[in-house]
Design a protein with these regions (language model features):
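N-terminal beta-alpha lobe that positions the nucleotide/phosphoryl donor
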Residues: 1-206
Length: 206
């Protein structure tokens, strides 16, 4: 449940000599904040979807959308507004025009606050045709290894319906690249748990 991702609960366990079966409080804090997780990927030289790497104001979201207009030579590029906290497909809004951003930003912030107790948002370019690939990784705080990949592209409302392991569509070279990226981030964070790193593979430019 939600306690498995609660930083304060993990800290209390640690302070009271109770073994918390899960990530350390530091790792929960790092990966529970998508902006800091994005920054870890950047620092690990793992490619990320173009976006903001910190809590993003409405004005910053508008500026980023304008930069997408310039970089794509399109008046109506696609952008995703996402909650910094949480998951499960909640706190996400697609926008396809500059005029829609203010209203969708407000809705997304409200949903994020209601679901996760944190209204912070960030934005990124929307990859409209993508495969969702996950790499399972396990670490003991020093050493890390992987348990291969699975494809989770069959979704409804950003929530997985079907998982196929291993992915039947990944080329060997790309599979190795994704596994290496997951292991690099796990190693840099001192992973002491079993966790999943999620990747998007752009079908238009895999």
């Amino acid at each position: 449940g939600f306690l498995s991702e609660n930083v304060e609960f993990a800290k209390l366990c640690e302070q009271n000599g109770v073994v918390f079966i899960g990530p350390t409080p530091m790792q929960l804090s790092l990966f529970g904040d998508k902006s800091s997780a994005r920054q870890l990927a950047v620092n690990s030289q793992v490619p990320v979807v173009p976006g903001t790497n910190e809590k993003t104001s409405l004005e910053q979201a508008l500026d980023f959308y304008r930069s997408l207009q310039n970089s794509t030579n399109s008046d109506n590029p696609s952008m995703l507004i996402k909650a910094i906290a949480g998951g499960g497909g909640r706190g996400m809004r697609q926008v396809h025009s500059l005029g829609d951003i203010s209203a969708e930003y407000a809705r997304c912030a409200s949903e994020a606050m209601s679901a996760f107790g944190e209204s912070g948002l960030y934005v990124e370019a929307l990859i409209e045709h993508a495969k969702h690939i996950e790499i399972q990784v396990i670490g003991d705080g020093k050493n890390v290894t992987h348990l291969w990949d699975r494809e989770c592209s069959v979704q409804r409302n950003h929530q997985k319906i079907v998982e196929i392991a291993p992915s039947p569509t990944l080329e060997p070279a790309l599979r190795k690249q994704l596994i290496d990226a997951a292991l690099t981030m796990a190693k840099r964070s001192g992973l002491k748990s079993l966790t999943t790193f999620e990747f998007l593979v752009d079908l238009n430019a895999p």
